[in-house]
From Swiss-Prot:
Belongs to the RuvB family. GO terms for biological process: DNA recombination; DNA repair. GO terms for molecular function: ATP binding; ATP hydrolysis activity; four-way junction DNA binding; four-way junction helicase activity. This is Holliday junction branch migration complex subunit RuvB. The lineage of its organism: Bacteria, Bacillati, Bacillota, Clostridia, Eubacteriales. It comes from Desulfitobacterium hafniense (strain Y51). The RuvA-RuvB-RuvC complex processes Holliday junction (HJ) DNA during genetic recombination and DNA repair, while the RuvA-RuvB complex plays an important role in the rescue of blocked DNA replication forks via replication fork reversal (RFR). RuvA specifically binds to HJ cruciform DNA, conferring on it an open structure. The RuvB hexamer acts as an ATP-dependent pump, pulling dsDNA into and through the RuvAB complex. RuvB forms 2 homohexamers on either side of HJ DNA bound by 1 or 2 RuvA tetramers; 4 subunits per hexamer contact DNA at a time. Residues 329-348 are annotated as: Disordered. ATP binds at L20, R21, G62, K65, T66, T67, R171, Y181, R218. One of its GO terms (cellular component) is Holliday junction resolvase complex. Residues 182-252 are annotated as: Small ATPAse domain (RuvB-S). DNA binds at R310, R315. The keyword Cytoplasm applies.
């Protein structure tokens, strides 16, 4: 898949945005319910001198799960060890990490749903009993020893909570879903980032970027940095609404935050399948994108904004999608669509 300016996934240039990350809950904007609950749990754990209970953060990418994990460690005044599901290839890799933790440390596992089942099972006793069972030797002479681990906090992050095994999910004491951000919160995030970058920006300019940021802080910060480039070359370095709008149009991010891939997806459903329904695999083959990419990256925002609906027979474009693309709503769409493929019967 081509690199998208508005993808919520992390891009190579986003590492420069680490300076924009908040380091305390007081500086973290948005996700009020999640933040307020974590504040209570952290204060209580500190008062008791205990490790914070294990935390599962789930939701679409780019909403601040990694940032929250680091904030938890900072607020708890402990170290954080960061890894990811794909990086832990063998159970021994996870065992080595667990035995290296200091008391009350935070272990952050991104994409925790991608842990292998055998590796995942090591976490069961570690999370619940604070122990690690290790088998030494092979065959009849093999023996099992139990190591006691220091109290620690596992923070797991995932975009696919449904793929976690129930025994693992049930061992998290705190489970929080991160939602797409409201425009007002994104304006505050953009204004804060502009201050850190020593960039002059008007409220209207911040609003224009926020509206096109797909409810995602990572996208907002990325677009802000690109608009800054246009402001320095085209103008006097100050970001106004007009400058932001022209810059984002140039980047092919429309006023609703849709890019060429989003529009291609909607146009395919409308023009080739009479508005739908169309199954995921058929849509994937038609537009030339992987089904997983459509499901994880493209669809969440289109669903959240009401441009498509998912039905038992497949994806359907809504009236709002027609209106946004300036396409007349046809009778087949109003009747529920007749454009499903022969392949769609077995598809979601």
């Amino acid at each position: 898949m081509e690199e998208r300016m508005i993808t919520p996934q992390q891009l190579p240039g986003d590492q420069e945005g680490e300076v924009l990350r908040p380091h305390r809950l007081a500086d973290y904007i948005g996700q009020t319910k999640v933040k307020d609950n974590l504040q209570i749990f952290i204060q209580a754990a500190l008062a008791r001198g205990e490790a914070l209970d294990h935390v599962l953060l789930y939701g679409p990418p780019g909403l601040g799960k990694t940032t929250l994990a680091n904030i938890i460690a900072t607020e708890m005044e402990v170290n954080i060890r960061t890894t990811s599901g794909p990086a832990i290839e063998r159970p021994g890799d996870l065992a080595a990490i667990l035995t290296s933790l200091e008391p009350r440390d935070v272990l952050f596992i991104d994409e925790i749903h991608r842990l292998s089942r055998t590796t995942e099972e090591i976490l069961y006793s570690a999370m619940e009993d604070g122990c690690l069972d290790i088998v030494i030797g092979k065959g009849p002479s093999a023996r099992s020893i139990r190591l006691t681990l220091p109290p620690f906090t596992l923070v797991g992050a995932t975009t696919r909570a449904g793929q976690l095994a129930s025994p693992l999910r049930d061992r998290f004491g705190v489970i929080s879903r991160l939602e797409f951000y409201e425009v007002e919160d994104l304006i505050r995030i953009i204004t804060r980032a502009a201050g850190i970058l020593n960039l002059q920006i008007t409220l209207e300019g911040a609003s224009e970027i926020a509206r096109r940021s797909r409810g995602t802080p990572r996208v907002a910060n990325r677009l802000l940095k690109r608009v800054r480039d246009y402001a320095q070359v085209w103008e006097d370095g100050r970001v106004t609404q007009e400058l932001a709008g022209k810059s984002l149009d140039r980047l092919e991010v429309d006023p609703a935050g849709l890019d060429r891939i989003d529009q291609k997806c909607l146009l395919t459903i409308i023009q080739m399948f009479a508005g739908g329904p169309v199954g995921l695999e058929t849509l994937s083959a038609t537009i030339g994108e992987e089904a997983e990419t459509i499901e994880d990256v493209v669809e969440p925002y289109l669903l959240q904004q009401g441009f498509i609906q998912r039905t038992p027979r497949g994806r359907v474009a809504t009236v709002r999608a027609y209106q946004h693309l300036n396409i007349p709503v046809n009778s087949s769409h109003q009747e529920g669509g007749q454009g499903d493929s022969l392949f769609d019967a077995a598809e979601d």
